[in-house]
Design a protein with these regions (language model features):
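Structural detector for short beta-strands of small beta-barrel domains
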Residues: 40-44, 55-91
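N-terminal post-signal-peptidase region of extra-cytosolic proteins
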Residues: 81-83, 105-115
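OB-fold/S1-family single-stranded nucleic acid-binding modules
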Residues: 131-142
Length: 142
């Protein structure tokens, strides 16, 4: 005759709850580093070190209206400021972008400028809202 401990079902339940909580916390935001903003869910980027690769930039709107999700808008970069690197080698550049309708937004571009270039004055960029204040920008090839 096998004797089954009474706590066995309770321990399985607790383990299951722990796994669910850990999975949901991890999947909500990809780990970005202690002093960096979290990378939004659904963005195919694991680290801010990758931001700007192949001319694709994840940007956070600092001033101006957030863009609608999945609606591309064209803009022209007007400036590039505040690009000093932090302890992790990441710059948090501020860029003003003039949109096709004449309005302007200011974004934060967190990236490693030694790996991927800053957005520059005159760059033509396609912007698409992701969620909240997050937008994805893709440079047009010159």
């Amino acid at each position: 005759m096998r004797i089954q401990p009474r706590l066995y079902p309770v321990s399985r339940l607790l383990l299951g709850v722990f796994v669910l909580i850990a999975t949901s916390v991890y999947s909500y935001n990809v780990h970005a580093g202690p002093d960096q903003p979290p990378i939004p869910r659904g963005v195919a980027m694991k680290s801010w070190q990758e931001n700007g690769r192949d001319g694709r930039y994840l940007l956070q709107v600092l001033q101006g209206s957030a863009l609608k999700a999945a609606v591309p808008v064209t803009g022209t970069v007007k400036n590039d400021t505040d690009c000093d690197a932090d302890a992790e080698g990441l710059s948090h550049c501020h860029n003003t972008i003039e949109l096709a309708n004449g309005t302007r937004i200011t974004v934060i571009n967190t990236h490693n400028m030694h790996r991927n270039r800053c957005l520059g004055d005159g760059d033509l960029i396609s912007l698409t809202g992701i969620n909240g204040s997050w937008i994805m920008g893709s440079l047009f090839r010159k």
